[in-house]
């Protein structure tokens, strides 16, 4: 078999090999009923609200939807389109499975176009798709980044084929598509396009006006999303920008690039990726000048971007694994090493992808089993109830934490119940809680508590329970609270419990007839 240049196709460049890599990329997500990513239950709760609340009077009386051109709608839009066929939970699972599939396809296409053929080292980049941001449940961002990689790979292809109308249209319209998936996905796409423009037009250290003009004109193709951004980010929707130059955190996010469950395994995996890039930078491996420039642009952006960027938290954490992936794609074995050495490297890359995929599959299966145990309480929650959930995360927080802080949202999806677990992000979410729920208990920010003796910033469980507006809720759901720390108030009637979770009915005090009559005399 030969490639487009008439050269022999090696086994790591075959369709069968690429197909195997794509299967390995989706394998961890196949078993769990819903993807066990930290924020996903809250996202699914929002999807359930957005797809129609006609049959859920409690939800329709509390939530409102404010449609606006938010740069945070990728998975939302796809689930909205698919839910009539399969329901919200299966639609969410299907869309999230597509994220690593599209990401891997995009990364492999970038590597193939940059090197002229798929290098033996390319597969080393794929495990970075299952990165900390993905495990955290930043699914709209992850979809935006996947689209950015795929469209950038197509841009490189049509630039090689000398089809300027096609690649310019891809940048122009692709920018808008990626923006609506997630605004930071558009930023990632911009970094890729800017780095590529520098490679194409900056040909020497002596910068000319023609070079600057060519780079600027190519980058202006990215500007179409500025129209909805101006509409969206006007008024009170600008968001916070803070924590510049947290240098120690920068290295921490690189070490945490694949953070999930096993600190040594994931830390060493990240260091392997750094080491591979280092081999290219010092010249031991061949490095694509095009992708090296893209990597340097992303690295510069990573160093300067703050933790919070116009309301987007963990901004630098999201960029770290994507930057590493591009750095790995830039490297390749030197031709002088021969086919045997390249084949050995390809086998090592395949082994790395397989090991990472198997480990993530095991991790996700364990999270899914754990979630099933936490959610045994759901049948005891009356349909349409108003539930205040209080979650006590582990203390102290470690590398691996149980993904429980957003599990209360499963009561929205499976019991049509209100739960205080939607995100409070003005201008970044379409769903808002109405005035019937006091704001101090309306959103996810009200749900986390700490137990006595725990040195965390959340309020004490007992203090938070005392503040519950009893008239606004029917039930209290405690997660992560052991029996010794559970309340014994007379207005809380136990309904269900196990060693980790408890549900109480809130007993409202009846006004006595004497009190209704008022004072005498």
Model-identified regions with their sequence ranges:
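Signature aromatic-anchored transmembrane alpha helix within multi-pass, membrane-resident enzymes
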Residues: 329, 333-358
